[in-house]
């Protein structure tokens, strides 16, 4: 596990050209990540990003945030729909598993989203023992 300084977004949008079609992707996820990072740091938390190199594979995983104070690995998503949550589940569980295998440390999986989840999705995450942090006005709730 290699600790990295998390990037701050300087742009509100960036342009990508998948399949020869120009699209504009808003950087809502990075903005949410930056707001949460500032919030957590104001509470005295040591929060950063890391790189996880999977031994023998050449694959490097890059979780969005790690809170070293609360031992949480955090996947940030810009939406609250099932699609976003399902993707986040796979990512955050993989990160937590890899850290446990490589470092023999247990980091609790957390998903950070821009708003409250539906009861169904909240129940799913509870069943999987994945915590949720969501933004509500100018604060973050669990």
Regions found by a protein language model. Name each.
Residues 81-91, 120:
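Active-site-adjacent loop/helix micro-motif of nuclease/hydrolase catalytic cores
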Residues 5-52:
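Acidic-basic catalytic patches of nuclease active cores, encompassing PD-(D/E)XK
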Residues 78, 97-132:
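Nucleic-acid nuclease catalytic cores
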Residues 90-98:
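Short, well-ordered amphipathic alpha-helices
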Residues 46-69, 126-128:
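An acidic intrinsically disordered interaction segment
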Residues 129-141:
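Charged, structured surface patches that assemble and position nucleic-acid processing machinery
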Residues 36, 65-78:
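Conserved catalytic cores of phosphodiester-cleaving nucleases, focusing on short active-site segments
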């Amino acid at each position: 596990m290699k600790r990295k300084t998390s990037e701050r977004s300087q742009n509100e949008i960036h342009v990508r050209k998948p399949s020869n079609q120009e699209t504009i992707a808003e950087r809502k996820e990075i903005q949410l990540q930056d707001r949460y990072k500032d919030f957590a740091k104001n509470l005295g938390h040591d929060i950063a990003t890391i790189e996880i190199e999977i031994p023998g594979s050449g694959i490097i995983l890059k979780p969005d945030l790690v809170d070293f104070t609360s031992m949480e690995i955090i996947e940030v998503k810009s939406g609250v729909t099932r699609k976003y949550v399902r993707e986040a589940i796979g990512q955050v569980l993989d990160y937590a598993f890899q850290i446990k295998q490589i470092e023999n440390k247990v980091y609790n999986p957390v998903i950070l989203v821009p708003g409250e989840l539906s009861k169904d999705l909240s129940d799913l995450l509870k069943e999987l023992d994945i915590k949720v942090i969501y933004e509500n006005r100018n604060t973050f709730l669990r």
